[in-house]
Amino acid sequence: MEQTQTIIKGGAFLVEDVDINRVITPEDFTDEQKMIANTTSEYVQNEVLPVVENLEHHEFEHSVRLLKTAGELGLLAADVPEKYEGLGLDKISSALIAEKMSVAGGFSITHGAHVGIGSLPIVLFGNEAQRSHYLPK
């Protein structure tokens, strides 16, 4: 018999009775999740924030450089399976990257567009030829 679970949406865990084992808190993060969060925070602090004003003034050559650096760190490949040279991380790690990237001003949109509009549809819906062509680094 197939079991179904109710999805906890938004802040529902605050106002509804929820099994505590279904709520994830920072104390539950694995060492790998903490590491990717720290890597992203350091990247944003050291690479993005120093040029955020330049980006806001449409000096987009910085965006290209920053995306290349993010790619070298694996920050563009969290949801890409290892088979295609990605990190194949879990959704919590992917969410942590997005959270830490959110302080990066407009660059967080550049990053989000690349991973959310660019790569993720290919991961989820692309055929083998498309994945092999577009997903490798």
What would you call each of these model-derived segments?
Residues 2-10, 39, 46, 74, ...:
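Alpha-helix capping/hinge segments and adjacent helical runs
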Residues 42, 49-137:
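Glycine-rich flavin
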Residues 5-7, 32-38, 102-104:
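A ubiquitous short alpha-helical element
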Residues 1-32:
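Intrinsic disorder at enzyme termini
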Residues 27-45, 51:
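Mature N-terminal segment immediately following signal peptide/propeptide cleavage
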